[in-house]
């Protein structure tokens, strides 16, 4: 004769949910995580005396997905005020866009400068 052993596994989801007091005198409430928006960074283009205006418009259309009208408006702001904000992004995206613009400008032999600044 063989003795038969039976093992029963109980998982948390199998236990009946009870909202009753367990007698410990403690009330437990799950804390909701506090979420904050990530800090935002401005991507800024700076004016120089050598980069053609058409190239600046091309950069704004290519790397910031701006339409021709808005790209031209920002390019004119860069030209007249010395700098302009191209967009507001999280740090990683802002750094990537600035790096791409600077690399493309160097490859095209233009001194156009793009940097990021913390917003606020």
Swiss-Prot record:
Database matches in Pfam families: ClpS (PF02617)
GO biological process: protein catabolic process; proteolysis
Database matches in InterPro entries: ClpS, ClpS_core, Ribosomal_bL12_C/ClpS-like
SUPFAM superfamilies per UniProt: ClpS-like
Stretch list, region Disordered: 1-25
Function description: Involved in the modulation of the specificity of the ClpAP-mediated ATP-dependent protein degradation.
Self-association state and partner proteins as the record states: Binds to the N-terminal domain of the chaperone ClpA.
Family: Belongs to the ClpS family.
PANTHER family, per database record: ATP-DEPENDENT CLP PROTEASE ADAPTER PROTEIN CLPS, ATP-DEPENDENT CLP PROTEASE ADAPTER PROTEIN CLPS1, CHLOROPLASTIC
Protein name: ATP-dependent Clp protease adapter protein ClpS
């Amino acid at each position: 004769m063989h003795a038969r052993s039976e093992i029963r596994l109980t998982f948390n989801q199998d236990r009946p949910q009870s909202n009753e007091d367990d007698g410990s005198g403690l009330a437990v409430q799950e804390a909701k995580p506090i979420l904050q928006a990530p800090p935002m960074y401005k991507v800024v283009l700076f004016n120089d005396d050598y980069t053609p205006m058409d190239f600046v418009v091309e950069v704004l259309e290519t790397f910031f997905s701006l339409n021709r009208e808005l790209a031209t408006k920002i390019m004119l702001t860069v030209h007249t005020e010395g700098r302009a904000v191209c967009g507001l992004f999280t740090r990683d995206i802002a750094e990537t866009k600035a790096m791409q613009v600077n690399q493309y400008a160097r490859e095209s032999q233009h001194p156009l400068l793009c940097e990021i600044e913390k917003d606020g």
